[in-house]
Amino acid sequence: MINIRIKKLTQKGINVASIKRAHHDFDIDTPNTDSYLHRKAGSKQVIVSSSKRWAKITELDNKKEKRIEKLLKKLDNTDIVIVEGFKKELHKKIEIINQSNENYLFNEIENVIAVVSNSKLNANLPQFKKNEIDLIVNFILKY
C-alpha cells in the first residue's frame, strides 16, 4: 500500500525517500560476498558502491535503535520522506488501518493527521478509503 503511494509521488516528480522500521533483526547483505565477509570479520561500517547505487551498512553495538531524527539526517536530496513504523516518534502520521479493532493510534496520540481504512471510523480526522490513492497523495502534497 505504501509502495503505491511512493510510486504515485515519484510519477509526479517528487524525490521520495523512505524509512522502514524492522521489528526483527534483518540483513540486507548477501552471504559470502566481500561486504558480508568484511562485516563478519569485524568491520563496523561497510559501504558497497556501484555505478547504479550505494549502500552503507552500520553495525550497532548497543542494540539501541536509532531515533527517527538521527535517521532523517542520513538522507539527502529528498522532497518527502515516507516513514513506516516508528509509532511513538513525534512526526506527523497517516494511520493505515488494516483490520477492525478498537486500539487505534489516532485515539492514543495527537500527531495522526489522517486515517486510511475501508471502514467508517469515529475519528475527527480526514478519512480515506484504501483505494483512494490519488486523494491520499494529494493530501500528502498539500499538507
What kind of region is each of these model predictions?
Residues 37-38, 72, 104-107:
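Short secondary-structure boundary/capping segments
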Residues 31-32, 65-68, 130:
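Structural motif corresponding to alpha-helix initiation and N-cap regions
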Residues 22, 51-52, 61, 86, ...:
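Anionic group-transfer/hydrolysis microenvironments
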Residues 42, 76-77, 109:
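Short loop/turn elements that form and flank the Walker-type P-loop nucleotide-binding site
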Residues 3-60:
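N-terminal phosphate/diphosphate-binding loop that engages ATP/GTP or pyrophosphate donors
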Residues 80-142:
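Phosphate/Mg2+-binding loops and adjacent switch elements
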Residues 59-88:
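Phosphate-binding/switch loop-helix module in NTP-utilizing enzymes
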